[in-house]
Amino acid sequence: MLTWKHIFHSFALLLGVLVVSTAALAIAPSDLTLTQVVPNGSFNHPIGIRAPNDGSGRLFVIDRCVSEGSSATTGSIKIVKNGAVLATPFLTIPNVACVGEQGVIGLAFDPNYATNGTFYVVYTASGAKIGASEDQVLTRYTVSANADVANATGTVVMRVPDIANNHNGGDIHFGPDGFLYWSMGDGGVQGDPNGFAQCTGRSSKIANNTPAICHTSGSGVTYYLLGKIIRLDVHTTTASAAANMCASTPGQPAQYSIPPGNPFASVATFPNDCAEIFNWGFRNPFRFSFDRSNGDMYIGDVGQNTYEEIDYQPAASVGQNFQWNLCEGFHTYSSNGDTAGCTPAFGGVPPKIEYPHGPTCAVVGGYLYRGPIQQLRGQYIFSDYCTSAIYISASPAPASATWTYVTLGSAPFTPLGVVYGFGEGADGNLYVADDGHGTIWRFTSGFIFQDGFEGP
């Protein structure tokens, strides 16, 4: 395996057209480069990069697990500081299940991390579980007296039952409103036969207003939060959980509260719908992000057999249905093959980007670029798990029905192994988590001073 020592190594991306006009090729500088930040093998299975707003310049890398395929292993958060991975992990989480898509899969720093030292992690826990598969667990941690090491013990905020080791979602971010957003997959069974993605609670399926099961046959375990993005106030606890707080026991304390603007927040109006839900209709919103400039949400939702999609939610909106398992991309979903056209119904919102399978297979949601490379600013960058191609949406126009995009190269033309996620630095620089090589990369260009070259 190729390794890198002492210096960063850069690979120029080979620019190729996917589906876009010639004029749109100008969205990226001609010398756009991926610069390797640390040597190959620095991480076991990197899945994302985060940066606290504390002025330290450090990067925190989510290392999903040590032993992929193990039902009881460890995962960690590691720090890149001054261009090197610190020998001691920031946090090591024991008893992590890492089969399929499981592991340590989400990290979010509190907006006030610089003063309160609090952060949140999502992982799949081995051992006792509520549902058929390992629970998804949201835990609150704090930093120790050593800024590079966290306290090992945290407080569980929420446990969510699951039915399989895939479609775990698991991404978490604080929105511009200060609330925590958490993405959930639909449980992993092909086609979502239980209707989890369209079920908002005990009373109905939003899609067709008929009674919903929302649990596997005969199990008695409910999976109301699967196929959703939920929104929580993790700064305020609840003394006595309301009946519609689906991840808590009614009447018992909870480590979170419900933001009043959530679509089903009112227990009087929605006694049987889950107050935690922010939006729904997802298959596996594996990676999502907020535009740091205006708070808009960009969601990569992994498709079933035929299409991948990027969803968009304006900052001012709530309660949107992104239509899985009614639709896959712009098409009506069917286990026998999708058909053209999917009419939005029951508040349904179509995606902004759709692309077909072959050789692509699973979208990896990215970020709207707000970093130092001026030509990239305002462009949405994302990837695909099967090809590791880097895609850039050509100046997303939120009011447009669809967005165009280009590809900046695909394996073997880029140095990327397997793209698993992205992350922003505090300065807006964009990073790529490369599971294939156990490293991370940064988008760079000679057209900015930060990379050591004077621009024209």
Regions found by a protein language model. Name each.
Residues S42-G48, V99-F109, A164-G175, C274-S289, ...:
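Signature of short aromatic-glycine-proline-rich micro-motifs recurring in repeat-based ectodomains
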Residues L2-A12:
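Bacterial N-terminal signal peptides that target proteins for export
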Residues G329-T402:
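Loop/turn-rich, solvent-exposed surfaces of beta-rich toroidal or solenoidal domains
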Residues A401-G425:
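Conserved blade-ending motifs and adjacent loop-strand segments that build the rim/top face
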Residues V20-A23:
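N-terminal signal peptide c-region/cleavage motif recognized by signal peptidases
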Residues I27-S42, A150-G154, G348-E354:
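A short helix->beta-strand "capping" segment at the edge of beta-propeller domains
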